[in-house]
Amino acid sequence: MRIKKSDFITSAVKKNQYPIDNRVEVAFVGRSNVGKSSLINSLTNRKKLAKVSQTPGKTRLVNFFLINDDFYLVDLPGYGYAKVSKAEKDSWGKTVEMYLTGREQLKRVVLLVDSRHKPTGDDIIMHEWIKHFGYDVIVVATKSDKLTRNELKKNEKVIKETLKLNSDDKLYFFSSLNKDGKDELIDNLFLEFATDLD
């Protein structure tokens, strides 16, 4: 499928601010500065659809983007940034938890990890939490252009072992810089929810 149209619709903190048109939602979650905004911009061919912040932990809202007038891509606040207060961390945690708990429109959660590093304790908890609530989860390892082919192979093994991925679990490597595998990634993330398959 092709992403021909992408529009920012709304930012939300509370449930009553979420869209109410019952379209399917695919949520993106990951550590602060894992490259979430860059990935969203890359997939949609929009340089500034999702704001790329140089300051980790800046995205504190749940952001809804309408794709092809068909389904929502949902950008969740990043977690795991050390240099914020406990109150702010708790607030972000509640925002994410509120969205992920009992959201019927949410059909898939895409967990982003940094391909250069072993997944963190926060990544492991988030992966287990997503699976516990029964959501379909796909892991995308970002910034893969920074690794050699040998390093990619080695790190793929580390990511799979750390997150305890089985043979059915999906893991994709992606670089927002060179966009290798972009079409395949779009199909794997969104195709089954799209009504316009062009």
From Swiss-Prot:
GO terms, molecular function: GTP binding; metal ion binding
Amino acids binding Mg(2+): 37, 59
Keyword ATP-binding: no
Top-level taxon of the source organism: Bacteria
Cofactor: Mg(2+)
Pfam families according to UniProt: MMR_HSR1
Similarity annotation: Belongs to the TRAFAC class TrmE-Era-EngA-EngB-Septin-like GTPase superfamily. EngB GTPase family.
Protein name, entry field: Probable GTP-binding protein EngB
Organism: Clostridium beijerinckii (strain ATCC 51743 / NCIMB 8052) (Clostridium acetobutylicum)
